[in-house]
Design a protein with these regions (language model features):
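Hydrophobic ligand-binding cavity/cleft-lining segments
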Residues: 1-29, 143-148
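A structural detector for beta-sheet-dominated domains
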Residues: 4, 33, 41-43, 80, ...
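A short, structured loop/turn motif at beta-sheet edges
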Residues: 7-8, 54-59, 78-87
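Hydrophobic pocket/interface hotspot
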Residues: 10-11, 20, 38, 53, ...
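Residues at helix-coil transition
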Residues: 15-16, 25, 58, 117, ...
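Glycine-rich portal/gate segments that line the openings of hydrophobic small-molecule binding cavities
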Residues: 21, 27-68, 74, 147-148
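Beta-strand/loop substructures that line and gate deep hydrophobic ligand-binding cavities in soluble
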Residues: 65-114, 119
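Short, highly charged C-terminal tails/helix-capping segments
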Residues: 121-148
Length: 148
């Protein structure tokens, strides 16, 4: 996905939870730092996942393991400067070679696609996307209060 913002700004959007919470998860217990274990929460669904930060290369790469408690997989973001814009790719690997693994891979691909689209609209237009919130409207907790 091409995001028309500088690489440092796009990279920070995925490493600083105060920014990421505008377009993807709703809370993280800390920012990404090498070797850190943290929790990302999607409050609207009452869902969280534990994350291990394996590598960070400022403005170039993020490598994590996530879903540490249930079928962990590796996720890698790469950031490539293209003039005043940044090309971002997300790879998610390590799924089981089974029907359940295939289903999990497809669901993850959908989620990361929404996260990239959300990052693009937030960073380029300062519009809070509600893609993640609106993906499963029937599963949103009745007590959830969006930032809108």
């Amino acid at each position: 996905m091409l995001i028309r913002r500088p690489a440092d700004e796009v990279y920070q959007a995925f490493t600083e939870p105060g920014v990421t919470a505008w377009f993807w998860f709703t809370h993280a217990d800390r920012r990404l730092t090498p070797g850190a274990q943290l929790t990302w929460t999607w409050g609207m669904y009452g869902v969280a996942t534990r994350v291990l930060v394996k590598a960070l290369e400022a403005n170039r790469r993020i490598l994590i393991d996530w879903n540490l408690d249930d079928a962990p997989t590796e996720v890698e973001w790469t950031f490539e400067e293209r003039g005043p814009a940044t090309w971002v790719e997300i790879s998610n690997r390590g799924f089981a070679a089974s029907d359940a693994g295939m289903k999990a891979a497809l669901e993850a691909m959908e989620g990361f696609t929404l996260a990239l689209a959300g990052a693009k609209i937030w960073l380029e237009r300062a519009i809070e996307p509600t893609f993640i919130l609106d993906r499963f409207p029937d599963q949103v907790l009745p007590s959830w209060k969006p930032k809108l």
